[in-house]
Swiss-Prot record:
Keywords: Cap snatching, Endonuclease, Eukaryotic host gene expression shutoff by virus, Eukaryotic host transcription shutoff by virus, Host cytoplasm, Host gene expression shutoff by virus, Host nucleus, Host-virus interaction, Hydrolase, Inhibition of host RNA polymerase II by virus, Manganese, Metal-binding, Nuclease, Phosphoprotein. This is Polymerase acidic protein. It comes from Influenza A virus (strain A/Goose/Guangdong/1/1996 H5N1 genotype Gs/Gd). GO terms for biological process: cap snatching; DNA-templated transcription; symbiont-mediated suppression of host gene expression; symbiont-mediated suppression of host mRNA transcription via inhibition of RNA polymerase II activity; viral RNA genome replication; viral translational frameshifting. A motif (Nuclear localization signal 2 (NLS2)) lies at residues 184-247. The gene is PA. A motif (Nuclear localization signal 1 (NLS1)) lies at residues 124-139. Pfam families: Flu_PA. Its EC number is 3.1.-.-. Gene3D superfamilies: Influenza RNA-dependent RNA polymerase subunit PA, endonuclease domain. Its cofactor is Mn(2+).
Length: 716
């Protein structure tokens, strides 16, 4: 049978069928009848779609070989044969564009003329039997069903056969030929008997033993068993008066629904206290790069070689001294650590062959900075379980901090354009279907808007640092490895450029669990004088390490160069997410895409080109105390990207809590704006849940202040 399938069907169909079977863990060499059935079904779907187009007047037309320049659109979108993720993407896109109800199961085709999804069936049994099985499985009146059999019979929903006689005859003839070919090889009987009915997943699976007891224990009050709870839930009518439903749920609940009016919400209370401080793993707007253009030195691409080459571009090194000490740290150790880096880099250069990695000597200053031997000794629980006053450390609650202006400046800077490109346009191959062409066009427009954005630089920097640190943590667990902080970009003229921001030194890293911490010391170049905002840099010890000549309109000026040094830590799971910062553009691209989809459905055509090329139109970007801020579509793309990047850079439990809880209040306010007359109960409890996340995190405090601006303008 396998040989027959490979001879009988087009190689592309065979390849798609193999892929589909592998996706479900099935082997085409073993389940040969299933292999043949999938190939047959795919071929019928393709034949159904072949030669059917919609012309410029919106009429359905059949063209077998005509003018390639005619403005024709394929009448059918083929969904069958794509991998599941792509297939659902196509289905979602069609539903968003056309407003058709989303099907529960993946259909096979979409008919742009009749505006409906089609489920194609090919059966070796009675068409009526198979039709009923399909209809029972799909349970949707919106999806059109069309069944063919190998005996030339067919059946379709409401006897509406969609295609003309001739097109259907072609399909029936092909099925009859396949049957004859199989019969002549003695394969038909086995194939005919192997067809199973439509398989539907049984939704109720039995819970037994411990899980059953746990389920019975974890029910809401007044329910004695899971079965009774299930019966109650199945019979629960969701529409109707909320208060009645609540009282029906439990004797404990007596919620009073209060109307939510324009005057109801109050602003969020932001904490008082000293201004919040910088807590990102690396400097953002204040970072300074030492760069080389068109790098072609020996060992180019090896981080240590690149770093040494970048260091040689700067000639203003001076004897370092401390200009802003760290409040709690032993500051001379930070100074000695930098001197040690300079000395050991010098040692490398004196060697004949520069090594690929550099492990620092374990000096007392580095041991102190990396917390070596500082962890309390671990004792086996068996040895101390009898200690009467055994308890956990008392940990101090975080002290509240107030919102500082620097975090808004930091965000504004992330939305700006730089003079370099930080991402290349992907080479993804030719587009085949119309939907792929639209997707590529959107991606290219979006990439053009964000490739020069500073937030994109932060993505590449974050990915590089986290990847290098995770690699070193696994490969050199006991070593204090020196890791250069590097990024690569292209100048306006298209020349390659390698940048050095500074160095990290990794501490001991025996990371068994995802949350085990590896300490590191970061040393980063900057031209920002820390004394202007000392509260912002409280976790840093800042050294002055030299003077840099800068070209300005008035000629060359000399500016002091600083080194921001701090002890920091991260974990395997944080590094894993840091390495995946390239996902940020996807999130913002999806948000832009939903804006385009909304516009397209109003205009009933794809608006991608107009959306990006109409430079005169402005779009809402966000709220500020001044009102709704507006900007070009490029600015919207960059702002959305910067938000996504900052969510990654400043990820924290406070942000998780604030995002989840404030969203509830946001939805209530949106309902009020849409005149849906929302009602609430325990609004005070919701405010409490939001405000307990407003402690000291700069990004959360900024988001809360934006939320307050939104409340003010939304409820005018």
């Amino acid at each position: 049978m396998e040989d027959f399938v490979r001879q009988c069907f087009n190689p592309m169909i065979v390849e798609l069928a193999e892929k589909a079977m592998k996706e479900y863990g099935e082997d085409p060499k073993i389940e040969t009848n299933k292999f043949a059935a999938i190939c047959t079904h795919l071929e019928v779907c393709f034949m159904y779609s072949d030669f059917h187009f919609i012309d410029e007047r919106g009429e359905s037309t059949i063209i077998e070989s005509g003018d390639p320049n005619a403005l024709l659109k394929h009448r059918f979108e083929i969904i069958e044969g794509r991998d599941r993720t792509m297939a659902w993407t196509v289905v979602n896109s069609i539903c968003n564009t056309t407003g058709v109800e989303k099907p529960k199961f993946l259909p096979d085709l979409y008919d742009y003329k009749e505006n409906r999804f089609i489920e194609i069936g090919v059966t070796r049994r009675e068409v009526h039997t198979y039709y009923l099985e399909k209809a029972n499985k799909i349970k949707s009146e919106k999806t059109h069903i069309h069944i063919f059999s190998f005996t030339g019979e067919e059946m379709a929903t409401k006897a509406d056969y969609t295609l003309d006689e001739e097109s259907r005859a072609r399909i029936k003839t092909r099925l009859f030929t396949i049957r004859q070919e199989m019969a002549s090889r003695g394969l038909w009987d086995s194939f005919r008997q192997s067809e199973r009915g439509e398989e539907t997943v049984e939704e109720r699976f039995e819970i037994t033993g411990t899980m059953c007891r746990l389920a019975d224990q974890s029910l809401p009050p007044n329910f004695s068993s899971l079965e009774k709870f299930r019966a109650y839930v199945d019979g629960f009518e969701p529409n109707g008066c909320i208060e009645g439903k609540l009282s029906q749920m439990s004797k404990e609940v007596n919620a009073r629904i209060e109307p939510f009016l324009k005057t109801t919400p109050r602003p969020l209370r932001l904490p008082d206290g000293p201004p919040c401080s910088q807590r990102s793993k690396f400097l953002l707007m204040d970072a300074l790069k030492l760069s080389i253009e068109d790098p072609s030195h020996e060992g180019e691409g090896i981080p240590l070689y690149d770093a040494i080459k970048c260091m040689k571009t700067f000639f203003g090194w001076k004897e370092p001294n401390i200009v802003k000490p760290h409040e709690k740290g032993i500051n001379p150790n930070y100074l000695l650590a930098w001197k040690q880096v300079l000395a050991e880099l010098q040692d490398i250069e004196n060697e004949e062959k520069i090594p690929k990695t550099k492990n620092m000597r374990k000096t007392s200053q580095l041991k102190w900075a990396l917390g070596e031997n500082m962890a309390p000794e671990k004792v086996d629980f068996e040895d101390c379980k009898d200690v009467s006053d055994l308890r956990q450390y008392d940990s101090d609650e975080p002290k509240p901090r107030s919102l500082a202006s620097w975090i808004q400046s930091e965000f504004n800077k992330a939305c700006e354009l730089t003079d370099s490109s930080w991402i290349e346009l992907d080479e993804i191959g030719e587009d085949v279907a119309p939907i792929e062409h639209i997707a590529s066009m959107r991606r290219n427009y979006f990439t053009a808007e964000v490739s020069h954005c500073r937030a994109t630089e932060y993505i590449m920097k974050g990915v590089y640092i986290n990847t290098a640190l995770l690699n070193a943590s696994c490969a050199a667990m006991d070593d204090f490895q020196l890791i250069p902080m590097i990024s690569k970009c292209r100048t306006k003229e298209g020349r390659r450029k390698t940048n050095l921001y500074g160095f990290l030194i990794k501490g001991r890293s025996h990371l068994r669990n995802d949350t085990d911490v590896v300490n590191f010391v970061s040393m980063e170049f900057s031209l920002t004088d820390p004394r202007l905002e000392p509260h912002r840099w409280e976790k840093y010890c800042v050294l002055r390490i030299g003077d840099m000549l800068l070209r300005t309109e008035i000629g060359q000026v000399s500016r002091p160069m600083f080194l921001y040094v701090r002890t920091n830590g991260t974990s395997k799971i944080k590094m894993k997410w840091g390495m995946e910062m390239r996902r940020c553009p996807f999130q913002s691209l999806q948000q832009i895409e939903s804006m385009i989809e909304a516009e397209s459905s109003v205009k009933e055509k794809d608006m991608t080109k107009e959306f990006f090329e109409n430079k005169s139109e402005t779009w809402p970007i966000g709220e500020s105390p001044k009102g709704v801020e507006e900007g070009s579509i490029g600015k919207v793309c960059r702002t959305l990207l910067a938000k996504s990047v900052f969510n990654s850079l400043y990820a924290s439990p406070q942000l998780e809590g604030f995002s989840a809880e404030s969203r509830k209040l946001l939805l209530i306010v949106q309902a009020l704006r849409d005149n849906l007359e929302p009602g609430t109960f325990d609004l005070g409890g919701l405010y409490e849940a939001i405000e307990e996340c407003l402690i000291n995190d700069p990004w959360v405090l900024l988001n809360a202040s934006w939320f307050n601006s939104f409340l003010t303008h939304a409820l005018r």
